[in-house]
């Protein structure tokens, strides 16, 4: 989201060098690719558009028309938020609303000599590390179900465990948006969107913020080489 000449709205840009036409489509224009056609920036392969009055929470995709005439609907590879699977659209979001509280951690990190300071890293996949109990057996024991904890809920549980075990950092298996649970995040669709399986971008910010306040560093796995073949993705 941004403001141009006093008008609030959303600026979109995407690189699609082989496209004949690119449009932004969503509920706001009845998913009609003829309405919000993007402007090509010279020979750069980049298409752009500013859509006035569009607000946070708007669901959208890019409609791309190729040289063979066939259109394709693609999620925004630069989006910060996506619909919860099995839905595949991107969501307009504003990342500036969260108020961070980890100033003490950031000062400590800046003063730390990372080459010599001790480090003990706990690698974890959030979706399989712990899930919500959904049933109780005849002995009164909780049976783990398939529902994930959200980022805020698991932050509390993970921080407590990691501190008790003496780790200094957690390393998260990929939390970027991905279509398939079983891939553990290693088939990425949205590199700039924390997966909506566990909540909103603000929820993820809270997760990092909470661990920082508990004195725990957060490392993210980065997977730039695995592209799923889902129709709404890059490949």
Locations of the language-model features?
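Substrate-binding/active-site clefts of carbohydrate-active enzymes
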Residues: 103-116, 125-235
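The feature marks proteins involved in alpha-glucan
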Residues: 1-11, 41-123, 128-142, 146-148, ...
């Amino acid at each position: 989201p941004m403001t141009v000449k006093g008008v609030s709205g959303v600026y979109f840009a995407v690189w699609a060098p082989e496209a004949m036409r690119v449009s932004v489509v969503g509920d706001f224009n009845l998913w009609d690719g003829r309405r919000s056609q993007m402007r090509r920036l010279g020979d750069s392969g980049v298409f752009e558009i500013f859509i006035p009055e569009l607000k946070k929470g708007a669901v959208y995709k890019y409609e791309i028309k190729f040289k063979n005439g066939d259109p394709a609907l693609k999620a925004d590879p630069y989006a910060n938020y996506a619909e919860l699977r099995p839905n595949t659209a991107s969501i307009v979001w504003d990342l500036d609303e969260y108020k961070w509280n980890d100033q003490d951690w950031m000062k400590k990190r800046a003063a730390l000599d990372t080459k010599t300071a001790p480090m003990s890293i706990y690698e974890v996949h959030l979706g399989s590390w712990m899930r919500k109990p959904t049933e109780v057996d005849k002995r009164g024991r909780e049976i783990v179900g398939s529902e994930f904890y959200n980022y805020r809920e698991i932050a509390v549980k993970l921080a407590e465990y990691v501190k008790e075990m003496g780790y200094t950092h957690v390393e998260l298996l990929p939390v970027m948006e991905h279509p398939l649970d079983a891939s553990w995040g290693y088939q990425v669709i949205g590199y700039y969107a924390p997966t909506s399986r566990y909540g909103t971008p603000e929820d993820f910010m809270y997760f990092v913020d909470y661990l920082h306040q508990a004195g725990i560093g957060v490392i993210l796995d980065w997977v730039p080489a695995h592209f799923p073949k889902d129709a709404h993705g890059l490949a």
